[in-house]
């Protein structure tokens, strides 16, 4: 008979996946669009999504917040609080939508549908998030953000989420 607490084991595994996420972003990050270098791809959401499907959407959100804060204060410190907020909004939406859908349909087809819906939700939520938050932290006028919203910001978010799904 084992004396280990299942919740403690789950948290330990969650911690390992969060650490992997931070290591991945340390080694792999690059801009997808040369005209918007502040929009960088990184694979950090892959371990977070694994945690979400393995342990549930609330654990995925917990991992998202921890990873976003640690990355924002260390590996990606140049983004500061702006990067932390945007990461939590994007990945948080992704894990909650995909995680809750997958909880209802734990099949391969259910996982694919959940991931697709998560990708779409990510893309949709980041449009108003960029319009509201980006001007505050970057000083870019709303008109400049609006001009790149459909040709750059939406495709970037769909590409990043799609690859990480």
PLM-predicted stretches and their roles:
Residues 1-165:
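Loop-helix junctions at membrane interfaces
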